[in-house]
Regions:
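Non-catalytic C-terminal accessory modules of carbohydrate-active enzymes
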Residues: 11, 15-18, 88-227
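Catalytic cores of carbohydrate-active enzymes
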Residues: 1-123, 211, 218-221
Length: 227
């Protein structure tokens, strides 16, 4: 029964992938539904499209630096940018202050998230837009979201426009504290590891095993991390 179920599911997925591509994919441009409201991000998340689909997504949000997405699309958009190593584009979107951004609401003095990021609407209670916040400790500090473990692997990223960051998370109830500061192309990366945790850092393709207590690493950024 298990194999039959798997075969059926695979067949359904193949059918719908083909149907969605036929209905929405523009073979001339490489985009789905003209890329409106993060359509290309949804396609990439489903394993659809080609290299142009990613290129179009990056180009659009590099220029606009604003969200035209709903709360699900906002999450998927940021997720896909990060999944394809477009950290700077994602960071620019999340830190923007133009109309249609989180910073725009903050600039207006709002303390909650509107239903539409670019239009003042009757509903000012859409906290689900804030789901993208989960990427901040994971990406900026490298803290994994798997908390019930004593094996912790840090994979930090360093956005071009961010000079420093700090934060912590608990693993098996024990803290890992991270803080870093950037000077030119050099990162001073400090980590406190609680007793009983095995922690390592992966950066620039190199793995460094940390010891309990205070650790400090000097990381040289690669050229493509500052472009």
């Amino acid at each position: 029964m298990g194999n039959v179920g798997c075969d059926y599911t695979a067949g359904v997925c193949k059918h719908y992938r083909k149907s969605v591509t036929k209905a929405f994919f523009d073979d001339k441009t490489g985009s789905f539904a003209d890329g409106v409201q993060g359509a290309d991000a949804f396609a990439l998340a489903a394993g659809l499209g080609d290299r142009r689909t990613l290129d179009n997504l990056v180009a659009k949000y590099t220029v606009n630096r604003r969200f035209d997405t709903g709360f699900i699309g906002t999450y998927v958009l940021v997720e896909q940018l990060l999944a394809h190593d477009k950290v700077d584009v994602a960071f620019d979107l999340l830190s923007a202050t133009v109309k249609g951004s989180f910073g725009y609401l903050k600039r207006l003095g709002e303390t909650t998230i509107w239903e539409y990021l670019d239009t003042k609407w009757c509903s000012h209670a859409h906290p689900m837009f804030g789901a993208v916040a989960e990427f901040l400790p994971k990406v900026l500090l490298g803290l994994p979201d798997k908390e019930r473990t004593n094996e912790v692997v840090l994979r930090p990223c360093f956005p071009r426009k961010l000079s420093h960051a700090e934060g912590s998370a608990l693993y098996d109830g024990k803290p890992v504290e991270v803080r870093w500061r950037k000077t030119n192309n050099t990162i001073r990366y400090r980590v406190f590891v609680a007793n009983g945790l095995n922690v390592s850092v992966i950066c620039n393709g190199k793995t460094t095993v940390l010891s309990e207590g205070k650790n400090e690493l000097t990381i040289q950024l690669l050229d493509n991390e500052n472009e």
